[in-house]
Amino acid sequence: MNTELDLQIACEFDNLPSEAQFALWADKALSQYRDESELTIVISDEAQSQQLNNDYRGKNKPTNVLSFEFEAPPGIDIPLVGDLVICPAIVLAEAIEQEKSFHDHFAHMVIHGCLHLLGFDHIKSEDAFEMESIEKQLLAELNIADPYRDEI
């Protein structure tokens, strides 16, 4: 693997994926675009997710994943890509609502967040199509079904 992961569990939650699973998912997304990567994933509760979402996005509710891209100062070349903050309570609620496995949806959120750290976005429809296509391809390589199958 070319990705060094710092996994920080900031809340208790049953049935979380293993650190090895998080590392595999992050590496799957990041190694397509970078030779080396360093990433922090924070597993947060709903209160922390809501606070960060409000502070950085102006949305006063918890969310599934927040991406905080690291931008090195000019002349500094380090492999740090940034931080993901993932709220397992939201990921679980979405997985149940969308009739997906918890771990499959978690894999999607890690890959989705990593792609944001690499500069991908889904605000414009053409950008969303590109990002979703990459997500579907990477998830398929992990034997995970198309997460957008119901949106066609």
UniProtKB/Swiss-Prot annotation:
Cystines in this chain: none
Q: Which keywords, in A-to-Z order, does the entry hold?
A: Cytoplasm, Endonuclease, Hydrolase, Metal-binding, Nuclease, Ribosome biogenesis, rRNA processing, Zinc
A GO molecular function annotation here is: RNA endonuclease activity
Entry binding sites for Zn(2+): 112, 116, 122
UniProt superkingdom:
Bacteria
EC number(s) stated in the UniProt entry for this protein: 3.1.-.-
Q: How is the cofactor bound?
A: Binds 1 zinc ion.
Q: Name one Pfam family in it.
A: YbeY
Instruction: Give the location in the cell.
Output: Cytoplasm
Q: Which PANTHER family match?
A: ENDORIBONUCLEASE YBEY, CHLOROPLASTIC
Q: HAMAP family per the record?
A: Endoribonucl_YbeY (MF_00009)
This protein's name: Endoribonuclease YbeY
Source organism of the structure:
Pseudoalteromonas translucida (strain TAC 125)
